[in-house]
């Protein structure tokens, strides 16, 4: 039989006491408040402390840059090229005026100087195109003491290096284990809780239990990210029989919204851990899961969604119409499918603060596990959520126009750039129709003017 020495026994006892104290603190200050939806203000105090540290770090770097007679790096938030919203015809007119006395109205034929317009546009796009930069992390104006964001902040003193090292210890040795424990607790409770609720007979009690199990587990998962969320205009929260649409930055958008409301999720059936969670959730709540073969069938998807929203007793559906994650600086084209089914749409704008941690999931660069590790080793996830008034499709509006109107409202409220480009360009090649459109505009300008002159 293995006997412990007195010293070994003391260490084991101290370790047991430490784990007991840690679990008790975890239960009292994080899990129980999450269950009841209350906060002791610890996260907000933590956020204010971080802001003071970041401000001090910025001052130190500015001083270091000044001593070396260098200018501290500042990102170009509005792009590196000043662009005026002018049409192709107006710009070519301007080029022709500056190059010769001929004007477009008098000379409908092609001029060699027209090439300069297309060359300039091509170079501008290569240097500062407004689409592809939406698929990479947003640049920071000041360093947040994360090594992954220290690409442009070079003037780091010894004090800053020590502070950064202390931050690494805190994030990886304290926050990461704590967050993993909370995430494991939240996911385990979600699977077990929804499975148990699934065996209850249908009725109000089952709905009540399902709602509170979902809210409790999502709130624990929110705390696993040290998420500090500010919800605005909560009287506009989505109601049964409607569709909640939001801009999409990250998979955690779902947790952010579901920790404040009760939604039916829409998505593809997965395997592995995600599949276990999906099967457990659908037992307690009427989520809409599609098989891989069904996802590409637009008519089947629309039919399932229409059947769901027509039943006013069912939960609002949560949908991200962009179809991919964008870096939270803009809102890109909304797919029209969810706007064709005639339901009331509840727009939601989500804006993250990248100063504490970048929530954007660059799926072409990072896998899910790597992404979650980056999230759990960030300082915090800070964001604001705005619930906008419900919107319905007008009589003279088609689905595309309605989708664009909702998108514009979300972009305006969240302070995001409203873009018409498809987020699918992250992975797909630009369609030839986009190139052909520019060719048509130019040929119409030349041929159209020539026809007008012939008629006269």
From Swiss-Prot:
It is found in: Endoplasmic reticulum membrane. CDD domains: LPLAT_LPCAT1-like (cd07991). GO terms for molecular function: 1-acylglycerol-3-phosphate O-acyltransferase activity; glycerol-3-phosphate O-acyltransferase activity. Residues 1-37 form the signal peptide. Ubiquitous. High levels in testis. Relatively high level of expression in skeletal muscle and heart. Relatively low level of expression in lung. Pfam families: Acyltransferase (PF01553). Inhibited by N-ethylmaleimide (NEM). Its main location: endoplasmic reticulum. A motif (HXXXXD motif) lies at residues 248-253. Pathway: Phospholipid metabolism; CDP-diacylglycerol biosynthesis; CDP-diacylglycerol from sn-glycerol 3-phosphate: step 1/3. Glycans are attached at residues 247, 327-328, 362. The chain crosses the membrane at residues 156-176, 180-200. Keywords: Acyltransferase, Endoplasmic reticulum, Glycoprotein, Lipid biosynthesis, Lipid metabolism, Membrane, Phospholipid biosynthesis, Phospholipid metabolism, Signal, Transferase, Transmembrane, Transmembrane helix. GO terms for biological process: acyl-CoA metabolic process; CDP-diacylglycerol biosynthetic process; diacylglycerol metabolic process; fatty acid metabolic process; glandular epithelial cell maturation; lactation; lipid biosynthetic process; phosphatidic acid biosynthetic process. Belongs to the 1-acyl-sn-glycerol-3-phosphate acyltransferase family. This is Glycerol-3-phosphate acyltransferase 4. It comes from Homo sapiens.
